[in-house]
C-alpha cells in the first residue's frame, strides 16, 4: 500500500479507512475490538494502521465505547516494599491487557472515610471503569467497603482484623456485592509452612515478633501462629512491635537477650 501524506502530520482514522478501503465506522469497530468485523477486514485495517503508524485517541475511544480503559487504584503503605511491589505487578498486568492505571496514595493509618470518598470522587470524574483498593490496615479496609462506588471493585486485604471479610462485605449494597471481589496473600498457608519447619527441627519454644496490630496481614499472621503453634505444642512468647521498622524488633531482641543473660 502506497500513501501520500504530509510529513509529521498525525494520521487520522479517515486516512486508515481510505487506505484499507473500508468506512471509518469499520476502523472504529476494529480499534474497539468489536466482534462484528470479519477476520479478513480486521487484518486489512490492522495493516493500514501499522503502515500509517496510526494511534487512536484515548478520549475518542472512550467516547465511542463508553469506557475509559482506566482503573483507579487507591493504596496505603507507600514506603513499604510489599505494597509498592503489588502496585507494580498490577500496573504491568493492566498494561498487558491494554488498560491504564491511575494511582492515588493515602496514609494507611490516618486515612478517614472522607479522605477515601474524596479520592473515589476524583476517580469518578476521570470515568474510571473499575477500582482496585490495596487496604493493608483496618481503617482502609472499612473505608473501601463503605465507599459509594458502582463500578467493579477489587479489595486486596487480609482475612483477619478488627473487621472480618464477611463483616466488610455486609457493608456493601446487594447490587454492588456482585461487582466486588476480595483477594489477598495466603497468610495462613505461609504460617503453616513456618510452623511445620519448626516442628521438623524439633523446636518446642519460640519467640514470635508480631507486626503492628492495625495491619490486617500482621493480625492474620498472629492468629495463624497462635493456633498452629498450639496445635504442635510449641510454647511461644509473643513480642509485639508497633512498626515494621527492623530497628524496633532488634531492640526488643536485645532487651530479651539481656534479660536472659
Which residue ranges define each predicted feature?
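N-terminal helix-turn-helix DNA-binding module of bacterial transcription factors
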Residues: 1-69
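Short beta-strand segments enriched in small/hydrophobic residues
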Residues: 19, 26-29, 63-79, 85, ...
